[in-house]
């Protein structure tokens, strides 16, 4: 779904901010990929590697990188997540995992959050793209 709404955007639309506190499509694409990998590591009870430790404000900011480079990073991250989820066993889903300051939760809830989180931000990408299209049409 991300490719459908983001892949053909020119750089101006990919990094456009519809409002001062809003996020650009490019930042949302990057954030979905990085956060999904981070959640996979957290759900597996593994240490999160340095490249995936950046916080959302850093991931979401406009960098004006080439859209294709950001999309390739996203695709690679999501491929890694799909492969990681496919390799899980039932015992992996039931394992207690620490998540923030909450009491431990079943890893399944963290893995489920990968989908919920990505879907939420994909909706933002769609909305931002529609706003960009409307702006360009007027």
Feature roles, as predicted:
Residues 58-98, 106-117:
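Acidic/histidine-rich alpha-helical segments that form the ligand environment
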Residues 9-12, 82:
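Short, solvent-exposed, charged loop/turn and helix-capping segments
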Residues 3, 11-58, 97-138:
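Short, contiguous alpha-helical
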């Amino acid at each position: 779904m991300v490719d459908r709404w983001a892949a053909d955007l020119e750089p101006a639309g990919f990094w456009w901010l519809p409002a001062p506190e809003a996020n650009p499509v490019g930042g949302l694409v990057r954030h979905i990929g990085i956060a999904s990998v981070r959640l996979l590591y957290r759900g597996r009870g593994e240490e999160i590697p340095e490249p995936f430790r950046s916080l959302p404000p850093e991931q979401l900011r406009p960098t004006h990188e080439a859209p294709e480079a950001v999309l390739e990073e996203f695709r690679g991250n999501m491929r890694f997540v799909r492969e990681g989820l496919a390799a899980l066993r039932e015992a992996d889903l039931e394992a207690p995992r620490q998540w923030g300051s909450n009491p431990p939760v079943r890893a399944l809830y963290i893995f489920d959050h990968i989908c919920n989180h990505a879907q939420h931000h994909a909706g933002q990408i769609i909305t931002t793209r529609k706003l960009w299209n409307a702006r360009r049409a007027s």
